[in-house]
Regions:
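Charge-rich, low-complexity N-terminal segments
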Residues: 24-78
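Short, internal acidic amphipathic alpha-helical interface segments
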Residues: 28-30, 48, 94-138
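A mature extracytoplasmic/lumenal domain signature
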Residues: 69, 85, 95-99, 134, ...
């Protein structure tokens, strides 16, 4: 009887351990494109001087880059930068200006309507578009498509332009302050 009990226990242990094992997912073609694009972005960041002025930190996602810029800003305490390489063969760049250490949230400003109108004007006239994320935090953004290959020179131009967002924050100040 004890031999059968041991056999049953071993069989149960084998079934339980086998059920906990999951096959590793195969890398999809989209993942390969994302990984190659991310490697190219990292190469630009490592070699392009304006990108090296941004302090890059460990990103939360496997195809994300995160950093912040705080050199010589007049209106923002710092600019938080998030770059995502998507499955749709695009690169998203989002820059969240911090005003006195906090994101500019439409629910916490003096004039939400005026802020949104000014952000729409910026989107029409400026290099970056402006928007709100799901938390209603304001950001300046840019989006690249990879249809014609990796846009290295365009990426450099956008990275070089990130500090200019600080001037737009100055234009938003009348709508932020209470």
């Amino acid at each position: 009887m004890s031999g059968r009990l041991a056999l049953v226990c071993h069989a149960c242990a084998l079934v339980l351990s086998a059920s906990a094992l999951r096959p590793l997912p195969a890398q999809s073609p989209a993942d390969s494109i994302q990984a190659a694009t991310l490697d190219k972005l990292k190469t630009v960041i490592a070699s392009f001087e304006p990108a090296r002025q941004i302090r890059w930190i460990r990103a939360s996602g496997p195809f994300d880059l995160e950093g912040f810029y705080d050199n010589g800003l007049r209106w923002s305490s710092r600019l938080e930068i998030y770059i995502t390489v998507t499955h749709q063969a695009t690169i998203w760049l989002r820059v969240y200006p911090q005003y006195y250490g906090h994101h500019i949230n439409v629910n916490r400003v003096h004039d939400p309507s005026g802020l949104m109108q000014q952000m729409l004007r910026f989107s029409y006239h400026n290099f970056f578009f402006w928007g709100l994320d799901d938390n209603l935090d304001a950001f300046a953004g840019y989006q690249f498509t990879l249809e014609s290959g990796f846009p290295e020179e365009s990426v450099k131009e956008v990275i070089k332009s990130i500090p200019l967002i600080d001037g737009s924050v100055g234009d938003l100040t009348p709508f932020i302050l209470r």
